[in-house]
Amino acid sequence: MDALFIPQDHPARTMQDTFYLSSPESIKIDEERLMQWAGTHQDGRGTTSRGWGGVFDAKESERALLRTHTTVNTVKHIANNPAVPSRVFGVGRVFRQETIDRTHLPEFHQIEGIIHEEQASLPMLITTLRTFYSKMGYSDVRVRPAYFPYTEPSIEVEVLWKGAWLELGGAGIFRPEVTQPLGTEWPVCAWGMGLERLAMLILGLDDIRELYQPDLAILSKMPIL
């Protein structure tokens, strides 16, 4: 989370929102990377940002947890390929302390994508997202301003579903506080969305929990995506 410029006191990092592990309780982080993130958080080190200020706690950084975003893979890829143009797409399981309801699950799959190249831009990102959702069968797509600690500008993507707008994912351009410590000067278009929520819409379900219920009679009628 430090690599994504999420403040160490952000609500998303509390026990109420994240599954922390008891074994192992901590994971060793590369000292050089840790110092870069510490400087960025404290005073924006090398960027135009002033950072978050305050004290940076290395022990907080090393706390082991179940990933809340597949963006951890994105960060690793950019760090390993800072000067290589790339377009990366992936699907992975994530875990969050969510209250279970018709559109939320504590364990689900996230779709993640990035465009990492010198000419990457917000119009390119929006066009990519509109194309993606239109190929999924959603012609009514809208983009709204949003806020995420790790992107600026930030947007949310919504599709029209049963007469109402349903938020499917967040996106934006990674902030310099994220990209510069990873060694790249190029902009990075990034987006993520929930696979189960998208599947719910495609299958015409009213409740996301139906995707995991054990009724064989219902499951036998579901198409294989």
List PLM regions with ranges:
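TRNA-recognition modules of translation machinery and tRNA-sensing kinases, especially anticodon-binding
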Residues: 1-225
